[in-house]
Amino acid sequence: MAALLLLLPIVFLRTLPDAFEFPKMELLATGAVLILAIGAIRESARIGASSETAWLTALPHRLIAWVRSDLLGAGVVAYLGSALVSTVFSIRPALSLFGAPESLAGLKTAMATASIFFASRSLSSNQRWFHVMTSVASVAAAIAAGYALLQLYKLDPYTWAGYSTFGGENRIFGTLAHPNMLGAYLVMSLPLTVRVATRATSRLVKVAWVVVGAATLLVLITTLSRGAWIGLGVAGAAYVLLVSRGARATSSSSERRARAPAAGLVWPAVLAVLTIVLLLISAPQLRSALVERIGQIGNMSAPTTQSRLQLWNAGLRMGADHPILGAGLDCYGDAFPAYRSAEYVRIEWGGNPTKAHNEMINILATQGSLGVVAALAVVLLVARAVWRSTASGNPEIRGDAVASGAALAGFAGQALTGFTVVAIGALAAALAGWLGGAQDAETSRPDPVRSAGAPSGRSWIAGLIVFAGAAALFVSSVVNPWRAARMEYEASRYPMGSPFRTEAYARAAALLPWYDRYEREAGRSLFIEAVQSRDPDEAWRALERARQAFENAVRMDRRSGVLRAYLALVLSSEVRLRPTREGPARVREVAIDAVARDPLNPYVIGLAEQSLMGAELDAEAGSLALRCAKLYPGFAQPFADVGSMALRQGRSGDAIDTLAIAVRKDWHGDPQGKAKAWESLSTAYLRLEKYEEAQAAAESALRLNPALPTASENRLEAIRLRAGRD
């Protein structure tokens, strides 16, 4: 357990597509399998000590007694039950079971996190457990913060893509993939670090922990995470409240009531002052960004605030449409396209979120009212455990409960605008598990397993069954996803269209037949392979395989507009290569269906336009392009498509007018699309004998993509014709 809590926040592996969250998830799942196996072995020992009949007869009584003595544990089981039911009735049950990509919050994660809760609950009878747990969590926070400081001072030995930025500065993320997640973990760790410092007996150790706490607070502030700052404020308020609560509950004199809270607040005050001094000295480049970010906390018009509001609105509407069980555990991202707004697209441009960025709204959307009730029950029972433990007659338990309560309050505060990831959830579960035992520490007694003497034949059989079950669970939940992720990483090292890339994705898809991304990426690579092929027969075979891959992906995710848009593009290419009478009708059907399923996604609309254009269905393509241009007037692609259709129809003047607009608009990171627009514009100019403009347009295309053959030909032709005219 201690090793898990130490490693989960700091583990990352650069040889995986998801270098941070995926290895943490696999580590947590491995630990959970071991914990479940140990629990199963203990139960098999019970069976061996008596008999199967006696064990089954006693089981109902034991369960009733357990529920009465451990309401918090029963609440956690009830929440797991809600997650299980939402998984069974999910819009995508397999995804809910294993977790969505870039989210990893399925039933597998829920059960693994619950195992941490129950393991910590069982260890709470050991007086050293809280000290061990908080010490390793504080060490992990120090390591994560230390790596973040390297990033802050631009000393990171690794180069990372996809930085979150603000005010022109890269935001630090440490070992937790995103500044918000780093900030959330540090918020939880700070009260624990304060507690470790106050319990230290050596002055040198105490000072060392104070420095660690100050550095942690410094990093927390420089994450520029408003959610983490809110969590810090909530944690601070909870700390003051709980210290005061403990003093009132245990003091008999007014003098002691006055002193106790003040004593408890000395170290946090020292940390705060030291951090402010360090921040002013060491990070002057962040001062303006800090001021601006703080001003955005209450600014409802800030883009990120508007983005959150859009996500919350979508989550509430999702919950209203699936009021009892939700759309399915971890299916927010899959259900989101039906609730996407044009305003959200303008803010985030084409992103498909996997979370609602508010824990309760996310639960409502994915688990319905049943999940919300179960989650609220757990929250209230944890609060009850904190409140009872801070009034304990044991001063050690009281102080530990104050730190735990403040950490969990910080967790709840950041969850108002964020979400839970593996490291944060595991620490919260461990603290809640300890509280579940601490509130009854003075009365609870261990429930020993009676020894049965030498292992019996039945015990050996039970042990073998447990081992086989644990091995099967480990292979299906850890080994296969890990192998598939490694294959995906190897695939990503090859260019799009490479047979090696395609085959690696195909092998990954065979390992995880419920995961549509592998089929999608195999299909995309096959499509590019077909486009690049000069042999019509080879191109046709690649297109057939691409179509099959996208059809497989659509069967896995029947709601996806993106997958259908790619399928329409492949069908359109097949129509061009080997025309059939029914081909264009099939392209039209799939393209229109794709847009109907994700009607405000500009990329889906764009892919549908291109597929319709490829099948020479210009009327339908033009209608979609005009619709996209009205929704997103700054987006270049629909203007380029309208211009390309005009060029193909021989309306060169109209093509020039529209393409000239397109090349000046926003391509949203698509330089190849812009290059093609310049190339088409050069063709239109040539047709109208505007050779100087044609040469300039062709050269603009070649600056973006020197390999465009038509642009090269247009440039040479324009130069030749200009020379002939002169």
Please provide the spans of the model-predicted regions.
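TM-adjacent membrane-interface loops and short helices in multi-pass inner/ER membrane proteins
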Residues: H178, L309-P353, M360, Q367-A374
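Alpha-helical transmembrane segments of multi-pass inner-membrane proteins
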Residues: M1-F12, L28-R42, G75-S90, A105-Q285, ...
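C-terminal luminal/periplasmic domains and tails of membrane-associated envelope-modifying transferases
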Residues: Y489-D726
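Transmembrane alpha-helix boundary signature
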Residues: G39-W66, L84-G99, L123-R128, D156, ...
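Short, hydrophobic transmembrane alpha-helix segments
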Residues: V11-M25, A45
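Hydrophobic alpha-helical transmembrane segments in integral membrane proteins
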Residues: I281-G298, P455-F500, R517-E521
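Flexible juxtamembrane loops connecting transmembrane helices in multi-pass membrane enzymes
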Residues: G167, R171-F173, A235-G236, E255-R257, ...
